[in-house]
Design a protein with these regions (language model features):
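NAD(P)+-binding Rossmann beta1-loop-alpha1 motif at the extreme N-terminus of oxidoreductases
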Residues: 1-63, 86, 122
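Rossmann-fold NAD(P) dinucleotide-binding segment
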Residues: 51-112
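Rossmann-fold dinucleotide-binding core
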Residues: 93-173
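Active-site-proximal catalytic alpha-helix in oxidoreductases
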Residues: 128-135, 156, 160-192, 203-215, ...
Length: 291
């Protein structure tokens, strides 16, 4: 089994590292070549000069890129030297229609796509505990199991091509609600004069806890928002959710509220911070109260 990896960002780098630890990684490619060379120096794998070179050497290719156009550009770059029956496992978050488009392009060249977006944050990527939601043919999903097992704790086939991305869109709506609630609750606790570290410690064990409260409320307590899930990326994802909902004639209030908040954060230079920086917008809600 020869596996290549494309996209060594905050999520991709630790995911590729886990494939290396599992003894499956042949090599990597990254748009910023220096990042690929540094990873190759660290792990001893190969840094390919182009996606086509990687495609010629690998039976499985994992991709993790930032945007729909990036994914389609990578897929097109793979096609000239794609091995027959190669499986591309795309862990990016893109529109379901984009996943289906990529699947059609690969199928025409004799390959297959699994759309396999992930959830679990940078922590999950580092610890290989990601939840992986998959769309594609059953036989392709079964063949990809050794690769998926090296990347995450759980993987489930949700349906045909695009179903993984539709599931991820659902997840991103959940994330919007969770971070909104966590930020408003923490702002309320702060206004009440409660010790925020203690709030996290006790309520993180309660019925109202969520992954975002447990793992991101501490960022709010410290007022530090190191990049985990960047505002600009969740903003991109929620725009996908908005478009998908619009096809059903629906407007989702939590999506619209969060996009409005993100517009303010992006305009004030916080787009590269973790989405927990939304706490900045919640504390002023309590500024008009009495002492």
């Amino acid at each position: 089994m020869k596996v290549g990896f494309i996209g060594l960002g905050a999520m991709g780098r630790p995911m590729a590292r886990n494939l290396h630890r599992a003894g499956k990684l042949t090599g990597v490619w990254n748009r910023t070549a220096a990042r690929a060379r540094a990873f190759a120096d660290e792990t001893g794998c190969r840094a390919f000069e182009s996606p086509a070179d990687l495609a010629a050497a690998c039976d499985f290719i994992v991709t993790c890129v930032s945007a729909d156009a990036d994914l389609l550009a990578v897929v097109d770059a793979l096609l000239p030297r794609l091995r027959q029956s190669c499986i591309v496992i795309d862990c990016s978050t893109v529109a379901a229609d984009t996943a289906r488009d990529a699947a059609r392009r690969l199928a025409a060249a004799g390959g297959s796509l699994l759309d396999c977006p992930v959830s679990g944050g940078v922590e999950g990527a580092k610890n290989a505990t990601l939840a992986i939601m998959c769309g594609g043919d059953v036989d392709v999903f079964e063949r990809a199991q050794p690769v998926l097992a090296a990347l995450g704790r759980t993987n489930v086939r949700m349906g045909p091509s695009g179903a993984g991305q539709a599931t991820k869109a659902t997840n991103q709506i959940l994330c919007a609600g969770a971070i909104q609630v966590a930020a408003e609750a923490m702002a309320f606790a702060q206004a009440e004069g409660l010790p925020l570290d203690s709030v996290v410690a006790i309520l993180g064990q309660g019925a109202g806890a969520s992954w975002y409260f447990v793992h991101r409320a501490p960022f709010m307590a410290r007022g530090k928002y190191p990049a985990g899930f960047r505002v600009r990326l969740h903003d991109k994802d929620l725009r996908i959710c908005r478009d998908m909902a619009a096809r059903h004639g629906a407007v989702l209030p939590v999506v619209e509220t969060t996009l409005a908040d993100y517009a303010r954060l992006l305009a004030t230079g916080h787009g590269e911070e973790d989405i927990s920086t939304i706490f900045r917008l919640k504390t002023p809600l309590f500024a008009g109260g009495g002492g």
